[in-house]
Curated annotation (Swiss-Prot):
InterPro entries: Ribosomal_uL13, Ribosomal_uL13_bac-type, Ribosomal_uL13_sf. One of its GO terms (cellular component) is cytosolic large ribosomal subunit. Part of the 50S ribosomal subunit. This is Large ribosomal subunit protein uL13. Disulfide bonds: none annotated. This protein is one of the early assembly proteins of the 50S ribosomal subunit, although it is not seen to bind rRNA by itself. It is important during the early stages of 50S assembly. GO terms for biological process: negative regulation of translation; translation. The lineage of its organism: Bacteria, Bacillati, Actinomycetota, Actinomycetes, Propionibacteriales. Pfam families: Ribosomal_L13. Residues 126-147 are annotated as: Disordered. One of its GO terms (molecular function) is mRNA binding. Keywords: Ribonucleoprotein, Ribosomal protein. Belongs to the universal ribosomal protein uL13 family. Transmembrane segments: none annotated.
Length: 147
């Protein structure tokens, strides 16, 4: 008997919606990354995109633990002299919460061509509304310890 390998056309894709209100950013990112990669499915294969679509709503109400809002920093450099920009996670959440969540999920994914394709299935919205009602997304609950 040969080992089963999923084919690209056989993959059944589901849509999940995650409410990020009062959810810790790291826990949300790991859950979303696992759903995007398809690791929750028995047909998972690391070389084939078996993942689902993930819609994250209320990204502006996400939680950070400890002093991460001020002490966790992100460094960007333009490549020119004096081109270093330092941004805290709190500033990033205030300015663009969508980008902060996308960046956290990106950090949980492998760095290859397949993950770039899988990240295109992540949709993040700052408020409670999203335009994907036609896809009938299923709510996905993240269980967490009280903060």
């Amino acid at each position: 008997m040969t080992t089963y390998s999923p084919k690209v056309g056989e993959v059944q894709r589901n849509w999940y919606v995650i409410d990020a209100e009062d959810i810790v950013l790291g826990r949300l990112a790991t859950t979303a990354a696992n759903l995007l990669r398809g690791k929750h499915k028995p047909q998972y294969a690391p070389h084939i995109d078996t993942g689902d679509f993930v819609v994250v709503v209320n990204a502006s109400k996400i939680a950070l633990t400890g002093k991460k809002a001020t002490d966790s920093l992100r460094y960007d450099h333009s490549g020119r002299p004096g081109g270093l920009r330092v941004t805290s996670i709190g500033e990033m959440l205030a300015k663009n919460p969508r980008r902060a969540v996308e960046r956290a999920v990106w950090g949980m994914m492998p760095k290859n061509k397949l993950s770039r394709q899988q990240l295109k299935k992540l949709k993040v919205y700052g408020g409670p509304e999203h335009p994907h009602a036609a896809q009938n997304p299923q709510p996905y609950e993240i269980t967490q310890i009280a903060q």
